[in-house]
Amino acid sequence: MAAQIIDGKLIAQTVRQEVAARVKARVEAGLRAPGLAVVLVGQDPASQIYVSSKRKACEEVGFISQSFDLPANTKEIELLALINELNTNKEIDGILVQLPLPAGIDTTNILEHIDPEKDVDGFHPYNVGRLSQRIPKLRSCTPKGIITLLERYNIPVRGKHAVIVGASNIVGRPMTLEMLLAGATTTTCHRFTQDLEHHIRQADILVVAVGKPHFIPGDWIKEGATVIDVGINRLDSGKLAGDVEYDVAREKAKYITPVPGGVGPMTVATLIENTLLACEQYHSD
């Protein structure tokens, strides 16, 4: 029997509606709407599309969105000055710096200068550290979005074997921490992992984020597993494909995310959720 499709678009829309209702209640109570600053450096086409979707999502839920589009030749010191300004702006609850940044700008330095209480991407070492200590506040958007999908579909995590393929700072590493927090036994696979197939065949929950189309053969999937495909890759044909061989995996898995329409929409929805959380918990004066 083919797997049940995990509809990320539907769940993301539900999350946005929930946030919009809370924002409406805030405003009706005389409180200000949450504010999100979106910073884009350069004119990378993919980044422009992502930023546009984030700004649109802000407007839909009633946030105040401030846009800062900087030229590609912006110096690091100039970007840091803007971040420092936004850190002290009491009407800004979240600061989002769209990645990747142009060559010559130290991404780590930029992200570490964002006030951790405005780090709605969840990338700051302080917030990742809180997650590792089981006291999370602002959590990385894609991993948290995946946890939301599992929760909304009532897919059990506690006591299950979760295998994460990919160890990036944006997805793989915080995803491992999220799975630990949820009570899973976790295995994280990366480029030095030997016998990848062996690990994947053990996975009750498989999360793949490597950025290579059809990297995981579908017949490696354990019968009845949950497959979360974070990859989004454009093929020569123009079609989008995930990191997992979808058609074959779907016949073995119990649940599976499609590409597109699975994890992607949840990343933006969680960003919106984080911004409201930052407003309510840190800046609601």
Curated annotation (Swiss-Prot):
NADP(+) binds at G166, A167, S168, I232. GO terms for biological process: L-histidine biosynthetic process; methionine biosynthetic process; purine nucleotide biosynthetic process; tetrahydrofolate interconversion. One of its GO terms (cellular component) is cytosol. Its EC number is 1.5.1.5, 3.5.4.9. It comes from the Bacteria. One of its GO terms (molecular function) is methylenetetrahydrofolate dehydrogenase (NADP+) activity. Belongs to the tetrahydrofolate dehydrogenase/cyclohydrolase family. NCBIfam families: PRK10792.1, PRK14186.1. This is Bifunctional protein FolD. It comes from Photobacterium profundum (strain SS9). The lineage of its organism: Bacteria, Pseudomonadati, Pseudomonadota, Gammaproteobacteria, Vibrionales. The gene is folD.
